[in-house]
Amino acid sequence: MRRIDFRFAELRANGRKALIPFITAGDPSLEATVPVMHALVRAGADVIELGVPFSDPMADGPTIQRSSERALGRGAGLAYVLEAVHEFRREDAATPVVLMGYLNPIEIHGTRRFAEAAVAAGVDGLLLVDLPPEEADETRAIFTEVGLALIALASPTTSEQRLDMLCSTAQGYLYYVSFAGVTGASNLLDTYAASDRLRQLRQRAGAPVVAGFGIKDAASAAAMAVDADGVVVGSALVAALAEADDVRSARERAEAFLAPLRQALDQA
């Protein structure tokens, strides 16, 4: 959790926006995950969101659903994800890593047992898509005790009452879903409406606010970053990596995809 706080403080001091790429652990191959993570850092990633493959990813569009299915088919379970983070930490002790996933695998593992294992591996935070904020107190308490940030999600349909709760309990950063839908549906991105909401959230939240869903290239990243503390890019990157033939190709594709977004954010 401290790595996340330090990174955003550093970015704020330098007047820069956070670039947060999302990849699915185990896709395009088990061997490629860690090399791709390092490649993303070289290309300008400030935080990495690592997707935990799940059999029923309800918030994800077809691109990430297929990616998750491929990863599960290769055996990329929770143990693999934590081992990948542990391996990444052998060379990178600074870049925050946030896991994005669903409750079921965590509950099967045992929340406290998982949280302790995640921190030991080098994980900084967790974003649980299907954990309602009204039911998050126990999980948040366990995570806070061991040093994990519980990243919250807000969307255009989030009620004011729930927003108040999210803003007052936000840890690490608040992830604003720029439209009500599934990941990858970039045609639904409404920059103007999202920007207005982002400005409001940044005034209310006790943590940085980042925007995701629908960001697919340098132009959309720069546009959304104007009123956010950072942007998350997922489906478009996952789609680019899916075409990789080997680890080297995956690394090259990761850097080639992300570098223009970094440049656009720094020039915005």
Curated annotation (Swiss-Prot):
UniProt keywords (A-Z) are: Amino-acid biosynthesis, Aromatic amino acid biosynthesis, Lyase, Tryptophan biosynthesis
Q: Which PANTHER family would you find in this protein's record?
A: TRYPTOPHAN SYNTHASE ALPHA CHAIN, CHLOROPLASTIC (PTHR43406:SF1), TRYPTOPHAN SYNTHASE, ALPHA CHAIN (PTHR43406)
What the entry lists under CDD domains is as follows: Tryptophan_synthase_alpha
How is the subunit organization of this protein annotated in UniProt? Tetramer of two alpha and two beta chains.
Query: Per UniProt, what is one GO molecular function of this protein?
Result: tryptophan synthase activity
- This chain's protein is named Tryptophan synthase alpha chain
Please write the reaction equations for the catalytic activity of this protein.
Answer: (1S,2R)-1-C-(indol-3-yl)glycerol 3-phosphate + L-serine = D-glyceraldehyde 3-phosphate + L-tryptophan + H2O
Q: Which SUPFAM superfamilies match?
A: Ribulose-phoshate binding barrel
The record lists the lineage as:
Bacteria, Pseudomonadati, Pseudomonadota, Gammaproteobacteria, Lysobacterales
Q: In which pathway does it act?
A: Amino-acid biosynthesis; L-tryptophan biosynthesis; L-tryptophan from chorismate: step 5/5
Question: Where in the sequence is the active site?
Answer: 49, 60
List the Pfam families. Trp_syntA
